[in-house]
């Protein structure tokens, strides 16, 4: 997977996208065939996958957390399954938010582990069975829609309404992970995030295919005494511009900004530069929760940077307060039907 999306992916298709179109065509054939023909294993609990059409962030992790909170409110014990992207561990691991570090397990699993049981595994089936062993009765996959090795009881695809699907081309000419027709066929529902219009064509396609469309917004938790502050905003996420818009919406005056690749592990020099620039201009440092978990327990002056940074926490808030419950209930019904079919086949 591409770690840093080139800017032309998110612009109107130009010469770069067309030059790479033969490779995109080949990539699309392979990705589409893999989605259609992949053998998928069953587990005895409902599986919800939170995915997106494109490379990069669209709000999958906060969506997964919102679904988990709704499950807990229903008396369920949800668990998260993540690949652990950005981490070095290649064995199935139960994540401990207090002891593990982002360099080992990835940043998103640490955010998830604050909410519920979280397992990272490059082998999804093995990871799912580990969650079942931990007593989980609802598995929520953060990403993995295009490469699922598990039978999914609900595939919720998240799309950012400002970025949409970028130039609409498949990797490497654009950000799209697999042919849209196949992705649309396999998704259960669509979640549009924000108030932009870049996702409107896909929303219409989903509605035409009788797929439910949910609406949500990322709501930041407003820090105390933040409005009007002069800040240095820094972020190592898929879409730093989205974070900067959030900071401005909260009333922060961004004097300086520093963008880094998604899942970026800060070097000592980068940390020193951020601290120096903030002090020189008398600015409040501000960053994302994902960046904060990468700094926690990191080397050198990372702890100093974290201590001096205002961390903006976010929540995914559905327009319909029953939306998350609807996703969960549908997954439970689909799981029951799946298990009944499996039992019927095994008894014949």
From Swiss-Prot:
Enzyme class of the recorded protein, top EC level: transferase
Pfam families documented for this protein: LpxK (PF02606)
Classification via InterPro entries: LpxK (IPR003758), P-loop_NTPase (IPR027417)
UniProt xrefs under SUPFAM superfamilies: P-loop containing nucleoside triphosphate hydrolases
Record field: catalytic activity: a lipid A disaccharide + ATP = a lipid IVA + ADP + H(+)
First and last residue of the signal peptide: none
One BP term from GO: lipid A biosynthetic process
Alphabetized GO MF terms: ATP binding; tetraacyldisaccharide 4'-kinase activity
Binding of ATP, residues: 54-61
Pathway(s) it belongs to: Glycolipid biosynthesis; lipid IV(A) biosynthesis; lipid IV(A) from (3R)-3-hydroxytetradecanoyl-[acyl-carrier-protein] and UDP-N-acetyl-alpha-D-glucosamine: step 6/6
Record has Cell division as a keyword: no
Source organism superkingdom: Bacteria
GO cellular-component term (any): plasma membrane
Keywords: ATP-binding, Kinase, Lipid A biosynthesis, Lipid biosynthesis, Lipid metabolism, Nucleotide-binding, Transferase
EC number in record: 2.7.1.130
Annotated function: Transfers the gamma-phosphate of ATP to the 4'-position of a tetraacyldisaccharide 1-phosphate intermediate (termed DS-1-P) to form tetraacyldisaccharide 1,4'-bis-phosphate (lipid IVA).
Assigned protein family: Belongs to the LpxK family.
Protein name: Tetraacyldisaccharide 4'-kinase
Native organism: Agrobacterium fabrum (strain C58 / ATCC 33970)
């Amino acid at each position: 997977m591409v770690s840093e999306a080139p800017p032309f992916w998110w612009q109107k298709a130009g010469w770069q996208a067309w030059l790479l179109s033969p490779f995109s065509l080949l990539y699309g054939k392979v990705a589409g065939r893999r989605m259609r023909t992949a053998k998928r294993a069953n587990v005895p609990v409902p599986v919800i996958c939170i995915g997106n059409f494109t490379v990069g962030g669209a709000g999958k992790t906060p969506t997964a957390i919102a679904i988990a909170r709704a499950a807990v409110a229903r008396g369920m014990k949800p668990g998260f399954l993540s690949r652990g992207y950005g981490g070095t561990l290649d064995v199935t691991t139960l994540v401990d938010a207090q002891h593990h570090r982002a360099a080992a397990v990835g940043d998103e699993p640490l955010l998830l582990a604050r909410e519920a049981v979280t397992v990272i595994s490059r082998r999804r089936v093995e990871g799912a069975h580990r969650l079942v062993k931990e007593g989980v009765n609802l598995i929520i996959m953060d990403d993995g829609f295009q490469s699922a090795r598990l039978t999914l009881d609900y595939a919720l695809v998240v799309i950012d309404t400002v970025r949409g699907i970028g130039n609409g081309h498949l990797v490497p000419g654009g950000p799209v992970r697999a042919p849209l027709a196949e992705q649309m066929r396999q998704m259960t529902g669509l979640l549009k995030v924000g108030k932009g219009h870049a996702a409107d064509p896909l929303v219409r396609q989903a509605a035409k295919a009788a797929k439910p469309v949910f609406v949500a917004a990322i709501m930041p938790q407003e820090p105390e005494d933040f409005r009007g502050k002069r800040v240095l905003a820094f972020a190592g996420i898929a879409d730093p511009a989205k974070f900067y818009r959030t900071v401005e919406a909260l009333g922060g005056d961004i004097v300086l900004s520093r963008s880094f690749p998604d899942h970026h592990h800060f070097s000592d020099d980068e940390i020193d530069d951020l601290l120096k620039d903030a002090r020189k201009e008398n600015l409040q440092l501000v960053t994302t929760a994902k960046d904060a978990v990468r700094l926690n327990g990191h080397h050198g002056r990372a702890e100093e940077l974290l201590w001096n940074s205002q961390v903006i926490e976010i929540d995914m808030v559905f327009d319909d307060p029953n939306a998350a419950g609807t996703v969960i209930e549908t997954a439970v019904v689909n799981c029951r039907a799946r298990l009944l079919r499996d039992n019927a086949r095994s008894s014949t």
